Design a protein with these regions (language model features):
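Phosphate-binding P-loop
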Residues: 6, 22-28, 287-290
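Conserved catalytic network of the ASCE P-loop NTPase/AAA+ motor domain
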Residues: 77-80, 93-94, 286-289, 317-321, ...
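Conserved ABC ATPase signature
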Residues: 232, 236-287, 294-310, 366
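Electropositive, glycine-dotted interaction segments
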Residues: 94-229, 233, 239-242
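Phosphate-binding glycine-rich loops of NTP-binding sites
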Residues: 29-68, 279-280, 331
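C-terminal lobe/lid and adjacent interdomain/linker elements of RecA-like ASCE P-loop ATPase modules
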Residues: 1-4, 310-387
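Conserved P-loop NTP-binding catalytic core
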Residues: 46-112
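N-terminal pre-Walker A segment at the start of P-loop NTPase domains
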Residues: 1-21
């Protein structure tokens, strides 16, 4: 009952979070956030990353890694507002939606407190669990058709004011923590991949790729070969990829054949192109865990050859039966490779970011073959569906 099994993420609601005043981002198998620079795409990703890091690093560090509490607050006419997030998901086999919500408030001295925190989990076997955290106490429960409902309560105290209640929320907290850890963000820094890396924990893929060698080394032979074959579809000539140990550090060794028939040559990571290292890291993140989850990739087109973009998108879409995928992009070529229903428009208006699906009047000329989504993107004519 505690293990969630397959999970499908449905939506995330953002209230007074960074540039978002009030918005809901709905997920599907594959979605792409498109919009101008500074429209709010990265801020939506920041919300997902914050939730992902709560069970891994704790709420205080997760907030600190975003620049601190004050940086998270949306400002309307100069006045800061307190942020809140709500993630809705569904466990396969359950007949009801589950959720986790978190609301933060300011206190003197630039600090924060958890105003409200709650979760509801509905399991495939008919069981359910949940918790509610207020200013002074946490109340949790668990019930199942085969046993009586059990309830637990305890006080939070001032020492827990800035902490998440998930570790203390028993069954619901354990399940929600496992669900949040299935959110994975990828923002690869090729320089981090190229440099010699410290051996590290293989449980968490660092979004910048700084521990990708350790993650790749933890794969079994079949998965390593799968990564190699998929990278070869993007970067012609890749024959093999291995982890090399140099003293107490790790790096990657690529073997690549040339088109002139000469013997394949070996290259260390620092000798490979940024595009190759980015594509490799994205594939490792994609295949690191066969459990269902949501993989978020910021601007996958950066440093990747134009001709390889469609191949990368095809590889990503081929995994959506197992893993939901969200990307942010400015690439018209990527947009042209996606169904219209996969696109989400992000725009900034009247002091706040917004997100919505494509407007129907935008879809009609595309469906009639008069224009492509990529051409509309280039001309800033991907209009959102405004309620």
């Amino acid at each position: 009952m505690i293990r969630p099994g397959r999970v499908r993420f449905l939506s995330i609601e953002l209230r007074n979070f960074l540039s978002f005043k009030r918005a809901t981002l709905s997920f599907s198998d594959f979605i792409a956030l498109v919009g101008p620079n500074a429209s709010g795409k990265s801020n939506a990703v920041a919300a997902i990353r914050l939730l992902r890091e709560i069970p891994s690093y704790g709420l205080p560090l997760a907030i600190a890694r975003r620049g601190g509490f004050d940086q998270l607050r949306h400002r309307s006419r100069g006045h800061p507002n307190d942020p809140s997030l709500k993630l809705t998901f569904e466990i396969e086999g359950s007949v009801r939606k589950s959720h986790y919500s978190l609301s933060l408030g300011a206190v003197k001295g630039g600090q924060y407190r958890v105003k409200k925190e709650s979760g509801r989990v509905f399991y495939a076997d008919g069981g359910r669990s949940g918790f509610d955290r207020g200013e002074e106490s946490v109340h949790s429960y668990v019930e199942h058709p085969k046993w009586p409902r059990k309830e637990f309560s305890f006080g939070t105290g001032s020492s827990l004011a800035g902490q998440s209640a998930l570790p203390a929320a028993l069954v619901a907290g354990t399940t929600i923590s496992a669900v949040l850890q299935r959110l994975q963000t990828v923002e690869v820094n090729p320089a981090k991949v190229a440099e010699l890396q410290e051996p590290s924990s293989t449980e968490i893929f660092e979004s910048d790729g700084s521990n990708v060698a350790s993650i790749f080394e933890s794969f079994d032979k079949t998965t390593r070969q799968e990564v190699t074959e998929r990278l070869a579809a993007i970067v012609p000539g890749i024959v093999s990829i291995e982890v090399a140990r140099l003293a107490d550090k790790l790096t990657l060794r690529f073997k690549q054949a040339s088109s002139d028939g000469a013997p394949a040559r070996e290259f260390l990571a620092k000798q490979m192109s940024d595009g190759t290292l980015r594509a490799f890291s994205i594939l490792v993140a994609l295949l690191q865990d066969k459990q269902s989850g949501l993989l978020v990739i910021e601007e996958p087109e950066i440093a990747i050859h134009l001709g390889a973009l469609s191949t990368l998108v095809q590889l990503l879409r081929s995994e959506t039966e197992q893993t939901q995928i969200l990307i942010t992009t400015h690439s018209a070529d990527i947009v042209d490779a996606l169904p219209l229903d996969s696109l989400r428009v992000v725009w900034y208006e009247k002091g706040a970011s917004n997100v919505a699906e494509l407007a129907e009047h935008t879809k009609i000329p595309v469906r009639n073959g008069l224009i492509t989504p990529g051409q509309l993107l280039r001309s800033d004519a991907l209009d959102p569906q405004i309620a």
